[in-house]
Amino acid sequence: MISTGIAAQNRKGRFNYTILETLEAGMVLKGPEVKSLRLGRATINEAYAGDRDGEIWLFNSYIPEYQGGVLSRFETRAPRKLLLHRKQVDKLLGAVARDGVTLVPLDIHFNARGVAKVTLGIGEGRKKADKRQAIADRDWQRDKARLLRNKGRE
């Protein structure tokens, strides 16, 4: 059971997109959805956030049915409303109006009070060359750390 910490993470989100800014939003969830999230079985790899009637919603996130209860029937891929202030919604909708910018859910976590939150990133899609450069940079950082770690042993 996860009382605080990350319940689901979109690991490809930071790789496929250059994240310009992050924002934390609350989620409207039912009881069995929260229990299922606390078990850590949710996935947001194909999820995205978008506009519906002037509000921000999370689409295509997968929260499996909670197996512990009898009345735990809910749609696993239902759109879920995100709770934001009006100024934040206007800012996000203005950012998404630009070409090539999208809202990427980066993780779902429980804060210190045990409330489910989703971290949204305003991201621009990366080209294939940018992804290759990111891989090369990551490999160089790993090799550099290995060289520094082994330097004293020689």
UniProtKB/Swiss-Prot annotation:
Which gene underlies this protein? smpB
Q: Does the keyword Amino-acid biosynthesis apply?
A: no
Task: Give the matching NCBIfam families.
Answer: PRK05422.1, smpB
* Primary location: cytoplasm
Q: Which HAMAP family match?
A: SmpB
Q: Where found?
A: Cytoplasm
Q: Which PANTHER family match?
A: SSRA-BINDING PROTEIN, TMRNA-BINDING COMPONENT OF TRANS-TRANSLATION TAGGING COMPLEX
Q: What is this protein called?
A: SsrA-binding protein
